[in-house]
Amino acid sequence: MNAIYPGSFDPITFGHLDIIERGCRLFDQVYVAVLRNPNKQPMFSVQERLEQIAKAIAHLPNAQVDSFEGLTVNYARQRQAGAILRGLRVLSDFELELQMANTNKTLASDLETVFLTTSTEYSFLSSSLVKEVARFGGNVEHFVPSHVAAALYDQFHPVVERDRLT
């Protein structure tokens, strides 16, 4: 069975990678699907996020990165996926995730949502938190792959400012 793992991944974190790696052990193919949402202003473009994710999952032969727009259930059908993979960090995540799972089940009764709890060491981690730490010059290499940390640093601290910080 194939699964999709949808999200904004702005940026991808070790928490996301934890879910992807574990999902790859459960499913034949996992499509890491970057949602193209015209109503949001992400830090990284869709293309940048696709490249960041592709590099981060290169070691996983049954993971593939893609982007989509519109309903998740339609994308799942397009990819012939029988499951939507979702990660849960804390209890407060569950309420919204359950609401989305029930909506998706109503729209596509043959599609299951599979929840994986994030490993304990990543339970506090979010893309928003990573961006906040990076914005104030903190080291984010414990939270994201090194190529993503470099991209964050470049985004928040251009070359001119970088010289001042070092």
Swiss-Prot record:
Keywords from the named record: ATP-binding, Coenzyme A biosynthesis, Cytoplasm, Magnesium, Nucleotide-binding, Nucleotidyltransferase, Transferase
Catalytic reactions of this protein: (R)-4'-phosphopantetheine + ATP + H(+) = 3'-dephospho-CoA + diphosphate
EC assignment: 2.7.7.3
Pathway named in the protein's UniProt entry: Cofactor biosynthesis; coenzyme A biosynthesis; CoA from (R)-pantothenate: step 4/5
Residues the UniProt record annotates as site (Transition state stabilizer): H16
SUPFAM superfamilies given in the database record: Nucleotidylyl transferase
Keyword Membrane included in the entry's annotation: no
Names of the cofactor(s): Mg(2+)
Listed CDD domains: PPAT
Family named by the database record: Belongs to the bacterial CoaD family.
Protein name: Phosphopantetheine adenylyltransferase
Classification lineage: Bacteria, Bacillati, Cyanobacteriota, Cyanophyceae, Synechococcales
Gene designation: coaD
